Amino acid sequence: MSKITKVFAREILDSRGNPTIQVDVYTLAGGFGSAIVPSGASTGSREALELRDTNTKYADNWYGQKGVMTAVDNVNNIIAPEIIGLCCKNQRLIDQKMIELDGTPNKEKLGANAILGVSLAVAKAAANELRMPLFRYLGGTNPTLMPVPMLNVINGGEHASNTLDFQEFMIMPLGFRTFKEALQAANKVFHNLAKLLKKSGFETQVGDEGGFAPNFNSHEQALDFLVDAIKESGFNPGFKGENAVAIAIDAAASEFYNGQKYVFKKLKSASLNKNQADLDEKFEFNSEELLNYYGQLLAKYPIISIEDGFAESDWQGFIAFNQKYGNNHQIVGDDLTVTNVEILKKAINLKAINSILIKLNQIGTLSETLDAIHLAQKSGMTAVISHRSGESEDTTIADLAVAVSSGQIKTGSLSRTDRIAKYNRLLVIEEYLNSYAKADYIGREVFYNLK
């Protein structure tokens, strides 16, 4: 048994310049692990609580009372004494001890950010002690599947100060033989998209996740540019065959749902400000109308996946969406399911989705995250490993995606070091796998959830 000898947390900054927590764990046998916790902008109401310094003695340390020194103190003064002396390889025991220490359903006492930082650092320390890559430690010797990247090349919604209400417009390079070739293809599409935007007079500033954030007149205009960029790069906008590049959308519909209707507030405001409101243009939808709108997009564009197409409270919207389009398209739950096993069970029973987005900080421990992934996969769903909009140089999710053979990873565009770090880690993992056996990249076949 290799004991944990030291646990230390500190306050650092994430990719948006907001405070976040970093945790270091040391073991008796010389193991060391360090983890940085991400943070979301558009969050589900049922997510585990990210503890900030609002109304505490640390409140004025940072802008908006967004410090995390309370969470840091909870690690150093409450969690550390309880896990020092425990075996670093007993991940589930340590995670369960922290859950019990907190004692609340959403980890609001100690903070999900405090608990997750320790949970991930413990796993990394154990892997380091064994001189083993993290993905090998978590997944064993079997995983060789590299994930298809979902690259968020056009940002909107809460991730950008532009006119788009849909949060993410992504490309998925499917028709390629290796992860590196897929990334090379995405690189060409990304830079050709920039060229086309500039040629058409659009700005090429980027949003939180490294994608471009132009002020388009419609979501369709964004999709048109994606199709043109794919073609300009010499690839096939579609799902199948050599050089196929598909499109994926994260609508993040909870952000434009007012409790009764779905309202494209940003597009509507931009249209009115420019005095370009078209009498036939529609900005407000009920659930059925929004479903029909998605149907029009799916018929016109090579969209293979839509995430959070309806608000987290609109279960009937999700059920109807999955029933109508789930055989041929990936219907992903994020805000709906928040990486929570109990909520996922409900989604499975209701057949509301055929895929779940996995975000470590939505649930707050590595063990609970793995439980959600395994339940989804056992139920015939895909599990898409995801970053958050507030990220760092931490690359845990790259290893996790390979460890669990998720087949898909969503970690931003080909811009901003906090996003590129994950892609670089995946390139290293692919090289490592090829040195021992052969890394697998299967493109369209990762969608085993589609009929």
Curated annotation (Swiss-Prot):
GO cellular component: cell surface; extracellular region; phosphopyruvate hydratase complex
Residues the record lists as binding (2R)-2-phosphoglycerate: Q167, K359, R388, S389, K410
GO molecular function terms attached to this record: magnesium ion binding; phosphopyruvate hydratase activity
Compartments it resides in: Cytoplasm; Secreted; Cell surface
UniProt cross-references to HAMAP family, sorted A to Z: Enolase (MF_00318)
Active site: E209, K359
Membership in a protein family: Belongs to the enolase family.
Top class in the EC scheme: lyase
The record's free-text note on cofactor binding: Binds a second Mg(2+) ion via substrate during catalysis.
Record: residues binding Mg(2+): D250, E307, D334
Functional pathway: Carbohydrate degradation; glycolysis; pyruvate from D-glyceraldehyde 3-phosphate: step 4/5
Catalytically driven reaction(s): (2R)-2-phosphoglycerate = phosphoenolpyruvate + H2O
Function summary: Catalyzes the reversible conversion of 2-phosphoglycerate (2-PG) into phosphoenolpyruvate (PEP). It is essential for the degradation of carbohydrates via glycolysis.
Major localisation: cytoplasm
EC number, UniProt record: 4.2.1.11
Obligatory cofactor(s): Mg(2+)
Key words, A-Z: Cytoplasm, Glycolysis, Lyase, Magnesium, Metal-binding, Secreted
The keyword Iron appears for this protein: no
Pfam assignment, any one: Enolase_C
GO biological process: glycolytic process
Name recorded for this polypeptide: Enolase
